[in-house]
Amino acid sequence: MADTQTKLSKTFSNFFASEKTSGILLILCTILSLSIANSLAGPAYQGFWHAIVAGLSIEHWVNDALMAVFFLFVGLELERELYNGELSNFRNALLPIFAAIGGIGVPALIHYTLNVGTPTQAGTGIPMATDIAFALGVLALLGSRVPASLKVFLTALAVMDDLGAIIVIAMFYTQQFSLVYLLSALAVFGLLLVLNRIFRVMSLLPYLLGGALMWFLMLKSGVHATIAGVLLAFAIPFSAKADDEKSPSHRLEHFLHKPVAFIILPIFALANTGIVIGSEWQHELLTPNSLGIIGGLVFGKPLGIALLSFVTVAIGVCRLPDDLKWTHIVGAGILGGIGFTMSIFITNLAFTNNASIINASKMAILMASVAAGGLGFLWLSFFQQNDNQ
């Protein structure tokens, strides 16, 4: 684990340093969006996001274009972790991988069980995801009171969670499908791989231009266009040397970090958390869909993460890092229930053109994420304080 932390020290510390501020900014944007949506300016606020620009609403541009940049950033993070980070050592990678599988499977099972055979069964993917910015933002509030390896574990877990969410989006949330456009997008991806692997083109420009074309073709194919961001990340040249500043992947990740944290995600929060809280909000939170979301995020996440982690360590498949205790793993599992932006993103795909279900789902996500963040903070604070006594 020491080697892993040494490898990650510079990049990871820079990444983690701004998560506290980013998390606070997301909270402020959410409060602002909720306040405006439930004021006299609410209709105008909703009308702004639904205004059509170049054939798509502003909300669609945010969710399809800006979030593709977010997924590009997530893909670059994942690539770094696979090459020289927490996931580069197979044995180190196994624990967050199995934890992520549990954190995806149990919440999905809870939602599916409550909604099977109904239209809201489409929301099974909603409680699968973890909001990296919010989860690490809450953990950052604890500062040095938690072990550094817990921050690394939660980062790897959240990245694997989002990878699972990306796969779910590609497989289950594709509406109309065009094989010609999809094959064309994959052909562009193949061409970018050739530029990287064979011709060793190190300039970012051809990759960014190819990525823009791939995004357009993905959009036309019916597969969600954000997938292009992840594919582009793995097509961009990466150096196996930790923190190699000449690496195109490293340079792009470094460039995107602050725009993603302080521009893209806050805009996404403003566009997607304008939840209208009506007089029937208590009833809406008691529907099978809302209960599945809340149950999946608040209870399913920590249960799945902790249970599968414990089983795999008990049978000798994985190893618990020396400075981590099971209370830390449970705490990370609770924080994994902060679905927020990622869960809202999947909600918009699951219930297209059904505003009432989308609004109720967002309310459930918001409540579950607040509960998970608060419980996770209190849990880790309590046990860390006891450990230090």
Curated annotation (Swiss-Prot):
One of its GO terms (biological process) is regulation of pH. InterPro entries: Na/H_antiporter_dom_sf, NhaA. NCBIfam families: NhaA (TIGR00773), PRK09560.1 (NF007111). Keywords: Antiport, Cell inner membrane, Cell membrane, Ion transport, Membrane, Sodium, Sodium transport, Transmembrane, Transmembrane helix, Transport. Gene3D superfamilies: Na+/H+ antiporter like domain. It is a multi-pass membrane protein. Na(+)/H(+) antiporter that extrudes sodium in exchange for external protons. It is found in: Cell inner membrane. The lineage of its organism: Bacteria, Pseudomonadati, Pseudomonadota, Betaproteobacteria, Rhodocyclales. It catalyses: Na(+)(in) + 2 H(+)(out) = Na(+)(out) + 2 H(+)(in). This is Na(+)/H(+) antiporter NhaA. GO terms for cellular component: plasma membrane. The chain crosses the membrane at residues 24-44, 56-76, 94-114, 122-142, 152-172, 176-196, 216-236, 259-279, 291-311, 326-346, 363-383. The keyword Kinase does not apply.
